Amino acid sequence: TPEHQRYVELFIVVDHGM
């Protein structure tokens, strides 16, 4: 689902921020 993809992208951004 598109919503899941959005969460995945957000998680990646947070991971890179860490």
From Swiss-Prot:
One of its GO terms (cellular component) is extracellular region. Expressed by the venom gland. Signal peptide: none annotated. The keyword Metal-binding applies. Binds 1 zinc ion per subunit. Keywords: Calcium, Disulfide bond, Hemostasis impairing toxin, Hydrolase, Metal-binding, Metalloprotease, Protease, Secreted, Toxin, Zinc. Its EC number is 3.4.24.-. GO terms for biological process: proteolysis. Contains 3 disulfide bonds. Its cofactor is Zn(2+). Coiled coil: none annotated. GO terms for molecular function: metal ion binding; metallopeptidase activity; toxin activity. Its main location: secreted. It is found in: Secreted. Monomer. Belongs to the venom metalloproteinase (M12B) family. P-I subfamily. Snake venom metalloproteinase that impairs hemostasis in the envenomed animal. This is Snake venom metalloproteinase Bfon25. The lineage of its organism: Eukaryota, Metazoa, Chordata, Craniata, Vertebrata.
